[in-house]
Amino acid sequence: MTSQRSLPADDFGIYYVLAECTDYYDTLPVKEADGSQPCSQGVTGLRNLGNTCYMNAILQCLCSISPLVEYFLSGKYITALQNDCSEVATAFAYLMTDMWLGDSDCVSPEIFRSALGNLYPAFTKKTQQDAQEFLIYVLNELHEALKKYHYPRRRSHEKGSAQRCCRKWITTETSVITQLFEGQLNYSIVCLKCEKCTYKNEVFTVLSLPIPSEYECSLQDCLQCFFQQDTLTWNNQIHCSFCETKQETAVRAGISKAPKIIIFHLKRFDIQGTTKRKLRTDIHYPLTNLDLTPYICPIFRKYPKYNLCAVVNHFGDLDGGHYTAFCKNSFTQAWYSFDDTRVSEIPDTSVQNATAYLLFYSCQPFSIPIQKH
């Protein structure tokens, strides 16, 4: 009789169960360490299918997020699949399998691109696309394919309109995507005439941050700019339900639910009418201990500090350019540069650079998946 080995629960509530993969995955060849590297799983290049560097960079970042990869490698996604929209999620699972358990230095994302292109034809064209927009489409489609319905119960003991508003469930649909990436902003809106305050919730998977300087600033500067109080006047006035007319208002945002993995979009592309330009500001961002305490509502400060786990870089201008990715591997704990099929290990000091476009931060360090011996 064989004994069942218990698996440790990780900080995300998802088991690291690479050792318990299905028989199909067991038949796939696994990359062997060459002696100089502890392991090369998850360090695989992606072929460029014609201006698809934006897609490759995003896929490498998602491939570096262990709890997401484990969810697909374990086969858990199969039981959650919605039959009418399973093609993208299934193609994503096969691609993650090739990138983690295959024996090739690089693989082709053609099947995944084709599946997503059936829904969004723009991604099948050999033209450059925006990596942030592509990321949002991918996360949305994975959520739609894997969502389950949840019916929340009322909390009768809560007092205060702000607290009640913050504690409402974000959505009745949950998935591995919402569990990992979805956060919630809470806006306090004060009418400057009657001084009454109302609250509004807004979910997010990516936070788009303004860049307050043209030359140099920090990620904290971008966060402070995003979360500072804003006064809406003239054409931007908001309807006040108490005054029953549009009024000048003061609006301030806070994070009422911090996601386990928070993604920042640095708004480098400035488009005003027919004028387009790229902000080449050198933005300094920490690799560890990003403190979000000032921006999280006090009663929801469960994950105040974050560590960087992946970066999407953009070179060039708005009408062209090239995307690459920096990702931290959960096996080796080393950083790697992914430039389509070209993969190389880089020192921590190289992760900070002036071309960063998307930043992926995790509230907990990723655990090393259990390997089958």
UniProtKB/Swiss-Prot annotation:
Q: Catalytic residues per the record?
A: C53, H322
GO BP term (any one): proteolysis
Q: What is the lineage of its organism?
A: Eukaryota, Metazoa, Chordata, Craniata, Vertebrata
Query: Is Nucleus included in the keywords of this UniProt record?
Result: yes
Q: Name the domain of life.
A: Eukaryota
Protein EC: 3.4.19.12
List the catalysed reactions. Answer: Thiol-dependent hydrolysis of ester, thioester, amide, peptide and isopeptide bonds formed by the C-terminal Gly of ubiquitin (a 76-residue protein attached to proteins as an intracellular targeting signal)
Function, as annotated: Deubiquitinating enzyme that removes conjugated ubiquitin from specific proteins to regulate different cellular processes. Regulates the inflammasome signaling pathway by deubiquitinating 'Lys-63'-linked polyubiquitination of the PYCARD/ASC adapter protein. Regulates the ubiquitination and stability of the ACE2 protein. Acts as a negative regulator of the G2/M checkpoint pathway, by preventing serine/threonine kinase WEE1 degradation, thereby repressing entry into mitosis following activation of the G2/M DNA damage checkpoint.
Question: Which range is the signal sequence, renumbered to this chain?
Answer: none
Q: Which residues form the USP domain?
A: 44-364
Q: What is this protein called?
A: Ubiquitin carboxyl-terminal hydrolase 50
List locations, semicolon-separated. Cytoplasm; Cytoplasm, Cytoskeleton, Microtubule organizing center, Centrosome; Nucleus
Family named by the database record: Belongs to the peptidase C19 family.
Does this entry carry the keyword Protease? yes
Report any Pfam family annotated for this entry: UCH
- What keywords are annotated for this sequence in UniProt? Cell cycle, Cytoplasm, Cytoskeleton, Hydrolase, Nucleus, Protease, Thiol protease, Ubl conjugation pathway
Instruction: Show the PANTHER family listed in the entry.
Output: INACTIVE UBIQUITIN CARBOXYL-TERMINAL HYDROLASE 50, UBIQUITIN CARBOXYL-TERMINAL HYDROLASE
Additional note from the record: The human ortholog is inactive.
Q: GO molecular function, one example?
A: cysteine-type deubiquitinase activity
GO cellular component entries: centrosome; cytoplasm; nucleus
